[in-house]
A protein has these predicted regions:
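Assembly/oligomerization interface modules of large self-assembling protein complexes
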Residues: 16-116
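Generic recognition of stable, solvent-exposed alpha-helical segments in well-folded globular domains
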Residues: 38-45, 53-57, 131, 135, ...
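Short helix/loop capping segments that flank catalytic or ligand/cofactor-binding pockets
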Residues: 60, 85-89, 99, 126-128, ...
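Alpha-helical scaffold segments that mediate packing/assembly in large oligomeric complexes
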Residues: 96, 105-110, 114-203, 330-335
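Beta-strand elements of well-folded, non-transmembrane domains
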Residues: 121, 316-320
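Extended oligomerization regions of viral-like shell subunits
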Residues: 158-305, 310, 314-316, 335
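Structural signal for terminal/edge beta-strands and the immediately following C-terminal loop/tail
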Residues: 319-335
Length: 335
């Protein structure tokens, strides 16, 4: 076979096989090179990517919360909303009456959250295509941050009694907090049946006056909820909120943050009712995340000489709670 015939044959085979490399290998024997694949460059190992749910919300949560240099948080309030506390008119000769107010307080103690990893030292030495140890540390920090952010908004989702559950008396989930801090706002009873998201907009608008937090809050919701709100149409089929900015304006919020963990999130109350949470409206500046000196994230590493393993521990000791009354609105459907 001459060179021209060989060249045409190689390219014809490449069209059928879909790969010039495979075609060259098939015709290698025609020009005296066997095992030509051994001469081809080897595949280059790239640094592995993490397969994980969307975690953009995690950074936003941890950036927005108030960082306190103290792990133990004590909140103290005087409830002066009672009718009996109003200033009174006086008629000469009558007795003046003192008013009595209620003192409300709570303490939040710190708890430890950690993630731990180990790897054989032989593997650390043998893996040369990317920095294995740095990659493991990156994964550990990613998962610790994600767990902390989840605990702040929703709780970690583990059942009571689970040995790994994050103590909800130490990191208080906004969605489950006392009504003094998180105001529960119920959607109309037929909301889930009708899937009419205009009711969501109206319910938020009518209950916005109950929000007493700092500044302009943000809405935390699932991607599906945000999509349904953006797809609300008028009677002519035109989108009422064609952009996120228009939706933010209608809801009177400064930001809309998608939280995958809110998809289908429910909480059960002592009366047996199921509350499906559709959204959380809060300014996380009103959530205090406290840590004493040394309680911030700390990484420890050790070497186990018996098993030839490198071990890593990343942990933080924190407390967390809303510190301002009525600083969150929980938009939910009750069944």
């Amino acid at each position: 076979m001459d060179k021209n015939e060989l060249r045409h044959s190689i390219f014809a085979t490449a069209k059928r096989e879909g790969s010039l490399k495979e075609s060259v290998i098939k015709h290698a024997g025609d020009y005296g090179i066997n095992d030509v694949e051994e001469l081809l460059p080897q595949a280059k190992q790239l640094t592995p990517e993490f397969v994980n749910s969307d975690v953009e919300w995690v950074d936003k949560v941890l950036q927005k919360v108030h960082k306190s240099p103290f792990a133990r948080v004590k909140t103290l309030f005087l409830d002066i909303t009672a009718e009996t506390l109003r200033a009174k008119g006086y008629i000469k000769g009558t007795e003046k009456v003192e008013h009595v107010f209620e003192l409300i307080k709570r303490n939040t103690e710190p708890t430890t959250i950690y993630t731990k990893q180990k790897i054989d030292r032989d593997d650390v030495i043998d893996v040369t295509d990317f920095p294995l140890v740095s990659w493991i540390k990156q994964e550990m920090e990613l998962k610790l941050n994600e767990e902390l952010a989840r605990a702040i908004l929703l709780g970690d989702g583990r059942v009571p009694g689970d040995p790994y559950k994050i103590d909800e008396e130490c990191i208080r989930p906004i969605v489950k907090d006392d009504d003094l801090y998180s105001v529960k706002v119920e959607l109309p009873a037929d909301f889930m049946a009708n899937q009419d998201y205009t009711q969501f907009i109206k319910t938020v608008a009518r209950n916005r006056k109950k929000y007493k937090g700092s500044g302009s809050p943000a809405l935390f919701a699932s991607e599906d909820t945000i999509a349904e709100l953006l797809l609300i149409e008028d009677s002519t089929g035109r989108l009422i909120y064609p952009t996120v900015e228009a939706l933010k304006s209608a809801l009177r919020v400064s930001d809309i943050i998608a939280v995958p963990e809110l998809e289908g999130f429910v909480r059960e109350t002592k009366d047996g009712k199921v509350h499906t949470v559709l959204g959380i409206i809060a300014n996380l500046a009103d959530y205090s995340l406290g840590a004493d000196k040394g309680g911030e994230k700390a990484l420890f590493d050790d070497f186990d000489i018996d098993f030839n393993q490198m071990k890593y521990l990343l942990e933080t000791r924190r407390s967390g709670a809303l510190v301002k009354p009525y600083s969150a609105l929980i938009i939910e459907n009750v069944e």
